[in-house]
Amino acid sequence: MPDELPPGPPPGPRDPGDAWAQGPDGTKAWGLFGAAGLLVDDGAGRVLLQHRVEWSHHGGTWGIPGGARHQHEDAVTGALRESAEEAGVPEDGIDLRHTSVLDLGFWTYTTVVGRAARPFEPVIADRESLALSWVPLAEVDDLPLHPGFGASWPALRAAIDIAPVVVVDAANVVGSVPDGWWQDRAGAADRLLDGVTTLAAAGLPAAELGLEFDRWWPRWTVVLEGAARDASAASTAPVDVVRAAGSGDDAIVEVVTAAVAAGRGPVVVVTADRGLRDRVTALGDGVQVRGPRWLRDRL
């Protein structure tokens, strides 16, 4: 720890959330509005862990950067802010994967799970860390873990490689509602892409994907064909735009084949085309199909 950072909690004004929440039985938990932390892996089999300073709650143990949520702050924003403040994690350098929520009724702790979008080295930026380290997955259990993180780690570890994908048959979805889309197919595709981009940023409830935990952020691929290929929207993570050179169905099958081969899944294909449904579900047990209404209801 740098010499210029003396031991003890940071001085100065604090957010109203930096206080103890108390349950009806007298149980206390830090964070008046709940708390959140970030579990980030580097895509190479390591996770970023924090060795907690002795004066902190469960000091001397290893866990993830995190802390009390600020007033009116959502859990994802809180986790990214805390990890930036404590460990120098770049807030724009994390691809969200899922959230796991511990709910005690009067208080919640949200573990936000992400993957580093680009390499970075953590930096001790405040008084709350003795050390920060990228720890190989196989060595996490060898450390003295914070009790809360230790209890959640087995389930989090088991899901570390789950990578859901949603593939959208744009022609089928756009054509499912007679709203005049045939007069401007490119414009209709752009409107669909705007909605998908908003949905991708918000994530999907885990149950929608048949997964555990609270919420997931899949990778989305929207396949355009014909005149819709003239849509102005470009690929912007986590939404990929594929402009099919020929058959849109063939392009969707190629996207799903590549996802399955890469070990990604579950893969959800949004289409009402029966022939396409049969082709994609034959590619693997992890491939599911939803109709256009499923997507439209969420848009």
Residue ranges and their predicted role:
Residues 2-37:
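Acidic, metal-coordinating catalytic segment for phosphate/diphosphate chemistry
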Residues 36-40, 112:
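Short beta-strand scaffold segments in enzyme catalytic cores
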Residues 56-60:
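A conserved beta-turn-beta hairpin within the catalytic core of GNAT-like acetyltransferases
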Residues 64, 167-168:
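Short hydrophobic beta-strand that contains or immediately precedes a catalytic carboxylate
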Residues 68-162:
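Unchanged
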Residues 163, 175-299:
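Nuclease catalytic cores that cleave nucleic-acid phosphodiester bonds
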